[in-house]
């Protein structure tokens, strides 16, 4: 599987700071047991970045507060 790069994710979320926040929130959700939106056997942080790069997750993560 191809390596994920920040540049791939920045195409979807241009602001690096928002990218980090969105990936962090999504990784927390995955860690709490939410289903991944892509097939992945990686850790939650990598899976979150892959979802962002694939366009499955975006800035809407910033509107959700992980519980």
UniProtKB/Swiss-Prot annotation:
InterPro entries in alphabetical order: DNA-dir_RNA_pol_omega, Pol_omega/Rpo6/RPB6, RPB6/omega-like_sf
Enzyme class: transferase
Keywords: DNA-directed RNA polymerase, Nucleotidyltransferase, Transcription, Transferase
Listed EC numbers: 2.7.7.6
PANTHER family, A to Z: DNA-DIRECTED RNA POLYMERASE SUBUNIT OMEGA (PTHR34476:SF1)
Subunit structure: The RNAP catalytic core consists of 2 alpha, 1 beta, 1 beta' and 1 omega subunit. When a sigma factor is associated with the core the holoenzyme is formed, which can initiate transcription.
Function: Promotes RNA polymerase assembly. Latches the N- and C-terminal regions of the beta' subunit thereby facilitating its interaction with the beta and alpha subunits.
UniProt family annotation: Belongs to the RNA polymerase subunit omega family.
Protein name stated in the entry: DNA-directed RNA polymerase subunit omega
Organism listed in the record: Verminephrobacter eiseniae (strain EF01-2)
Gene name of the record: rpoZ
């Amino acid at each position: 599987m191809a390596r994920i790069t920040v540049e791939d994710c920045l195409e979807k979320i241009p602001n690096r700071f928002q990218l980090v926040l969105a990936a962090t929130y999504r990784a927390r959700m995955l860690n709490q047991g939410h289903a991944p939106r892509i097939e992945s056997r990686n850790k939650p942080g990598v899976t979150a970045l892959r979802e962002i790069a694939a366009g499955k997750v975006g800035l809407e993560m910033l509107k959700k507060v992980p519980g």
